[in-house]
Amino acid sequence: MQILLANPRGFCAGVDRAISIVERALEMYGAPIYVRHEVVHNRYVVNSLRERGAIFIEEIDEVPDGSILIFSAHGVSQAVRAEAKARALTMLFDATCPLVTKVHMEVARASRKGTEAILIGHAGHPEVEGTMGQYNNPQGGMYLVEQPGDVQNLQVKDEDNLCFMTQTTLSVDDTSDVIDALRARFPKIVGPRKDDICYATTNRQEAVRTLARDADVVLVVGSKNSSNSNRLAELAQRAGKLARLIDSAEDIQEAWVKGVSCVGVTAGASAPDILVQQVIQRLNELGGVDAVELIGREENIIFEVPKELRVEVKQLD
């Protein structure tokens, strides 16, 4: 049984930065460090940080006065940010992915101008909640759509003054269909100057398409609440392949790979490489041969951690 590895796969720059922020805060200030929401959507990462003293919470009022708080990579609304700044916290660090912040700025700009904004995204996802929460102009409006059918039912105030943006971890193909529906219904709608779906999401989806050409089965390493990991599994399924989203090697069922000639392995943007290596080891135990790395798009983007975690401590304003 051949093992093929998608390339690129695993950690993106935003995830790497977010995890580094929590790790460095723990090193510099010691436990406990409070983090609003899971810093990234991966069970292994969250459990590892929890063991080191990170405490993951959902509401700001769960954080004691004098504590250190970190916002997750998914970003937060203006209301949550204001609530945190009003608290007597020692330090506040923002691990929001810079590419999510880019979308936040697009929404905030639309809000200032009074332009109605339509976000393409998944309801209930923390990134979507944070992005929607950047709009606060009652004269305008902020709307969420997930699929083309939502566009047909959407009622806006002014069809001539509309813009749209997207969640960063969506399916490129599905999002294109929704954008086509928006442009058909609202011909004057304006989109972002640069695609909101991030480079890592796009690259990993492109890589899984390549992987699915040769693999009979595709294993996607990623947690169930990881948006980008779910999209990878869906893409492989659409290619007609058996696809499974797994948290770890322990989830692999022997029946999935029995009699299979080629297994493809990829990982979502929040899944660490150690999990991929454990999956390869398990597949080898089930009859796999040495894993072959496919040729893919090179990624060399790095997002720096806040300067306070590089140089000196700065008190929260």
From Swiss-Prot:
Ligand binding ((2E)-4-hydroxy-3-methylbut-2-enyl diphosphate): 41, 74, 125, 168, 226-228, 270
Enzyme class: oxidoreductase
Catalysis: reaction(s): isopentenyl diphosphate + 2 oxidized [2Fe-2S]-[ferredoxin] + H2O = (2E)-4-hydroxy-3-methylbut-2-enyl diphosphate + 2 reduced [2Fe-2S]-[ferredoxin] + 2 H(+); dimethylallyl diphosphate + 2 oxidized [2Fe-2S]-[ferredoxin] + H2O = (2E)-4-hydroxy-3-methylbut-2-enyl diphosphate + 2 reduced [2Fe-2S]-[ferredoxin] + 2 H(+)
Signal peptide region: none
Pfam families named among the record's database cross-references: LYTB
Catalytic residues (UniProt): 127
Manner of cofactor binding, per the entry note: Binds 1 [4Fe-4S] cluster per subunit.
Cofactor(s) of this protein: [4Fe-4S] cluster
Keywords (A to Z) from UniProt: 4Fe-4S, Iron, Iron-sulfur, Isoprene biosynthesis, Metal-binding, Oxidoreductase
Pathway recorded for this protein: Isoprenoid biosynthesis; dimethylallyl diphosphate biosynthesis; dimethylallyl diphosphate from (2E)-4-hydroxy-3-methylbutenyl diphosphate: step 1/1; Isoprenoid biosynthesis; isopentenyl diphosphate biosynthesis via DXP pathway; isopentenyl diphosphate from 1-deoxy-D-xylulose 5-phosphate: step 6/6
EC number: 1.17.7.4
Family: Belongs to the IspH family.
Subunit structure of this chain's protein: Homodimer.
This protein's name: 4-hydroxy-3-methylbut-2-enyl diphosphate reductase
Species for this entry: Erwinia tasmaniensis (strain DSM 17950 / CFBP 7177 / CIP 109463 / NCPPB 4357 / Et1/99)
